[in-house]
Amino acid sequence: MLRTFRHMLLLCAVLLTAACSKEKTPTPRLELSAAEVVLRGGSGSEAAVTVTANGAWELTVTGSDFDITPVSGSRGETVVTLTATQENTQRTRRTLGTVTFRTGTGKSSGAERTLEVCQSPATAPRTMLLYMPGRSLLSFYNNNIDGIRRAVSAQVPGDGRILVCYQPEGQQTASLQEIRYDFATGGSVVETLKEYASFTASAPQSLAEMFADVAEYAPAEEYGLIVGCHGKAWVPTIAGSLYASGMQLGTQPGGAAVSDNLWQPLPDAKPTRSFGDTGYEIDIADFAAVIEALPYRFDYLIFDACFMANIETLYDLRAGFDYIVASPCEIMAAGFPYDRTVPHLFSGEGTYDRLAKVCYVFWDFYQNDWQSVPYNEQSGCISLCVTAALDGRDGQPGLDDVTRRLYAAARQTFDLNTLQSYEGLATHLFYDLGHYVSLSCVDAALLDEFRMRFDEAFPAESRLNTPSFYSAYNGRLNPIISYSGVSTSKPAQRLQEYYEQTAWDQATNTR
């Protein structure tokens, strides 16, 4: 009996061994986190991919001007780092070679994957800087950065560069960072390029240093600038402070409260980008001087700030930028939808066409999708300025020249209350420029000439508006009855002593 039992155990062992020997060998598996990796243009730049395998693997390299490590691995995930050994001095991306990954060794090789290795030009085709000074909008700034990160992919910004400068730690410091695509994770990463131990947003020298660093860290053939902050148009910082200390609450018709302070919102108003960070503002003329002194030129400026589509402001900035995108009224604190905006800024179209799409995306978001973010309203007005048309740098009579002749001609009076305004103050400061000229000009020929030149300076296709605009100064939506996309303070009954010092007034007033 015992011998029989032993024989049965032996038979079971033999059968089990036979069954195991018939099990299939696992199918070799080898995956890469990317099929292509693009190294930065400088020597020493690095990129990484993640290798996932169910067994041992090794690689072979064809090409030159890059190193790779490690050259083999085992089961699991392995991060492989590639390093450029030469600078790409060409104007376009170049192919350095390929890396072939194989599981197993020799004749036992199984799965195979190929990685293409490229290198961007050392001088990028395009660098975009998002500058967000101040801290009162910090949570919204962080949301804006997250929006950019969602937009970044293997194709966006491509060979371009995206830099961000803001003040996450305090009013006296700043951080210059880059948002780029990470081939190892398939997502975006944020890399700190420089920390500023001493940085004051109101100091021209701080801005000059930061702008110089942008060209140092991310040299490019073209530069674009987005400024996201509180905006006060042409109003000098001292004028705003003086008025804020001296004005009080007024009333709307019907007795509702309305602020008349520069720049004090009503209690419980929804947040916009028109106030905050008092004491850290920079006058627009000082900002323009910094820009004009740079050894390179920004092709465009996008203001993610309130009131900056203002003729007095745009005229101050005309020499520093070819195009300026801005809003004549308040911008909700959420700002631009960067996840939708950034891809257009790095498309293959010309600058004007790209910015026209940016205007549309901004308007479409606030017209149709404004409820997708909290503390928001259906309030989005935008326009695009072609600065060469303001002063005639395009070879035609400038808008300034036409306006000066129009202001010198006979004008009719009208009820100021019928003029489109762009804030909810009890005593208005910003009025619609096109509406003002239409109501006051009696010379039909001059008016036609103005409108023709105005349309060249502010193309109609990019003058977009929602039916109303929200103002934190009266805490409500205000209807838009006439929209030209740009404001003026010419008819305003406040701050005249400062207004007369603006370059626009001096160029157009004939008193």
Regions from the PLM with identified roles:
Residues 251-511:
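Terminal, contiguous helix-loop blocks that mediate binding/assembly
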Residues 80, 91-106:
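A short beta-strand micro-motif common to beta-rich folds, especially ectodomain repeats
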Residues 2, 13-38, 67, 106-122:
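Bacterial Sec-dependent N-terminal signal peptides
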Residues 166-170, 178-188, 199-294, 305-306, ...:
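Catalytic-core segments of thiol-dependent peptidases
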Residues 29-32, 48, 53-81:
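Surface-exposed binding patches on compact interaction domains or structured appendages
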Residues 85-91:
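Short, surface-exposed loop/turn segments at beta-strand-coil junctions that are enriched for proline
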Residues 1-9, 327:
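Bacterial N-terminal signal peptides that target proteins for export
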Residues 121-221:
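N-terminal extension/subdomain marker
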